[in-house]
Amino acid sequence: KYGTKFQARSNLFDHAAHNGSNYLKGHCFVSLMLHVPLKSADGITYLSVPLGYRLWTRELSKLELAADMVRSVMTELSSCRQVILLCDSWYPKKPVTGLVSEFENLEMICCVRSDTVLYDLPGERTGRRGRPRIHGSRLELSSIILNKPKGASYYMGCRKVITNLWKGRIVHAYVTATDPGKPGSFRLFLCTAAPEDIAVEPEKQAEEKICRYNTWGMLPLGLFSLRWNIETSYY
């Protein structure tokens, strides 16, 4: 296959500019991987199992493809097991974020753009007539208090917020930064589950990052580190 003479070819953005250009002609696949917790002598480890790869042909958007893949897997999993969907900043949009409302046992931990709109929680009702406020005032990432735990490479902080990605739902925003004085170094992650409601036993984990981030009070960030396995699965 070369040039433009092959089926389902698209002009794709390549952030790494592997060929010296920000764009390349090629195929785009949406992939889904399941991390299965296993007991071992060292503690709980995770077996990464690729579940599917779907070629993007423009009949559906990549977000719709991803949502369909997750939906097909969720219908096969036991509803009594908590499932956490990990994804990068491309996927936290309506077709995918809406899955959390479709399945009671599904939560989501995702990286999002640092300019994603965040709101404070609404204040207590005043007793006046009228509809109660859906959310508080808009928040800037710089308003979230960041600390650098011992042994950490980043400053980090957490705050309960409301976002338009899940309207009316309280989620947890996690912020990391190499330098709190430089907004360009901020990264933003969102978790739909409260840390205490995440069904893992941190003290039994064999994954070093999960244990370390749990010690710092940032368990969702440790779990998000498992997402990298889907990147290396292509190699």
Range-by-range predicted roles:
Residues 4-8, 39-235:
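Single, function-defining residue in the core of a domain
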Residues 1-43, 156-161:
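Active-site-proximal, Lys/Arg-enriched surface segment
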